[in-house]
């Protein structure tokens, strides 16, 4: 394992144990901050953020995560830097890797972020591509961990993704199957996960004990579901059909409404990556309900960013994956550091 450079471009390059470690790390840092202590785990570190597409949650959560933990973020807007234009992606990545400590990129094509990761000598985080959305994945699995049904583990749970096979749908399948969950896409033919991508989820499930199902049958999809997830019906990168044509395909069968939710378990939770088009893929009644966890989900984008940045920029955390003794030692030292710092801050107050 390369202890000096690790990217977060595709969660399929991580083990279940590594993902679980990041889940626990994110929750631990979140609890520390709620107790009033901001551990300076990213002190003097600088994140460069490349955005080829607009962003609300990703940009703000990344900037806030860096600031809260003692670091700094720079926004690199389209047109303000060379990236595959006058200067090659390779050259730009080499330069940024010499100046920055970590790079985040939201790109139109997955190839771009993969190339940045290949040539930059610092960690690179995929802030979303036309293929996947791994930071959303981690935030979502943290949210599900915080809202597990009583007596259940992640590996006992079933999640249903409703609608189009967007990059968020694909990412949900990747993460769910990695963690041993049962994943279902409830969507129309022509908008289901592509076979070559589906194979990755099936392989994950084979290893973890989870499952993957693609169906157009609502009763089959929602039976015993613990989580329901949806996304917009027209993705950032798809222009084959007009919004009107897509509405004809998806509405009303694939709208998450009270009637559809009633088919799931009585403890089901609703999720949406946002922004939501209310009245289309989800009704106001559902998104504003007491079983909706979309706002916790949005907040946990920052929880995920903290965990990812700290994990990538602290090699000792990656070493902990190779040795349970090192992991236990680091966990003990980290917990002690947080307790002492909180006590010191309270005494100062």
Swiss-Prot record:
Subcellular location: Cytoplasm
Keywords for this protein: Cytoplasm, Polyamine biosynthesis, Transferase
Pfam families from the UniProt entry: OTCace, OTCace_N
Cellular component, GO annotation: cytoplasm
Family annotation (InterPro entries): Asp/Orn_carbamoyltranf_P-bd (IPR006132), Asp/Orn_carbamoylTrfase (IPR006130), Asp/Orn_carbamoylTrfase_sf (IPR036901), Asp_carbamoyltransf_Asp/Orn-bd (IPR006131), Orn/put_carbamltrans (IPR002292), PtcA (IPR024903)
Enzyme Commission number(s) from the entry: 2.1.3.6
Pathway this chain belongs to: Amine and polyamine biosynthesis; putrescine biosynthesis via agmatine pathway; putrescine from N-carbamoylputrescine (transferase route): step 1/1
One GO biological process term: putrescine biosynthetic process from arginine via N-carbamoylputrescine
Molecular-function GO terms, alphabetical: amino acid binding; ornithine carbamoyltransferase activity; putrescine carbamoyltransferase activity
UniProt entry tagged with the keyword Cytoplasm: yes
Protein residues bound to carbamoyl phosphate: 55-59, 106, 133
Family: Belongs to the aspartate/ornithine carbamoyltransferase superfamily. PTCase family.
Function text: Catalyzes the phosphorolysis of N-carbamoylputrescine to form carbamoyl phosphate and putrescine. Is involved in the degradation pathway of the polyamine agmatine.
Protein name: Putrescine carbamoyltransferase
Gene: ptcA
